[in-house]
């Protein structure tokens, strides 16, 4: 488990965790989902990772933040002036976060397998497909899958997917 709430915190925390947990192993596989995958890509891009399995990864945080701004009817000027704006859907929009992801784009070269739910409400298919193509990742789409894999059917699909990828 990790405690980071932002990519700049993950950039400090994740390499220490990685070195402590994985430093003696010859090969390491990372399995992460959603924002954990984004944090891993942001913080561990230079680490010795053999492969990665990402479930519903956030692959374009700037786009996600801009989408959330639209959902909350918040302009970039509003966010810049107010610095942080709580939303009705439980997220707090942050100017610092938006600036950070713009200034620190993800560069990920680890061989990666991605599982994506067809009904993911945070990342569009176009976004995930473009990312997978750009980094040479395999992309598996679960029909009727959601962002959060949690039902028995989704968890069985996830388990079968990992077995097929190995």
What label would you give each PLM region?
Residues 43-44:
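Aromatic pocket-lining residues of Rossmann-like dinucleotide-binding sites
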Residues 31-40:
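Gly/Ala-rich beta-loop-alpha elbow adjacent to hydrolase catalytic centers
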Residues 14, 40, 128:
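Aromatic/hydrophobic pocket-lining residues that form π-stacking "cages" and hydrophobic walls in ligand
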Residues 23, 47-48:
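Short helix-capping segments at alpha-helix termini
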Residues 18-30, 110-111:
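Mobile, glycine- and charge-enriched loop segments
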Residues 1-22:
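Catalytic nucleophile-loop/oxyanion-hole region of alpha/beta-hydrolase
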Residues 48-130, 134-165:
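The alpha/beta-hydrolase serine catalytic core
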Residues 1-3, 37-38, 60, 148:
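Short secondary-structure capping/turn micro-motifs that flank functional sites
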């Amino acid at each position: 488990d990790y405690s980071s709430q932002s990519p700049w915190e993950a950039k400090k925390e994740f390499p220490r965790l990685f070195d402590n947990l994985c430093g003696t192993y010859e090969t390491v596989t990372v399995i992460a989902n959603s924002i954990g995958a984004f944090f891993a890509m942001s913080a561990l891009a230079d680490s010795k990772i053999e492969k990665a399995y990402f479930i519903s990864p956030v692959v374009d945080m700037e786009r996600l933040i801009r989408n959330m701004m639209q959902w909350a009817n918040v302009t970039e000027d509003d966010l810049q002036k107010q610095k942080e704006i709580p939303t009705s859907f439980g997220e707090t929009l942050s100017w610092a976060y938006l600036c950070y992801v713009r200034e620190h784009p993800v560069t990920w070269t680890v061989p990666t397998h991605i599982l994506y739910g067809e009904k993911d409400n945070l990342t569009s298919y176009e976004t995930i497909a473009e990312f997978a193509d750009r980094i040479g990742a395999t992309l598996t789409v679960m029909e009727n899958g959601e962002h959060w894999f949690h039902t028995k059917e989704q968890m069985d699909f996830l388990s079968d997917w990992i077995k097929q990828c190995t």
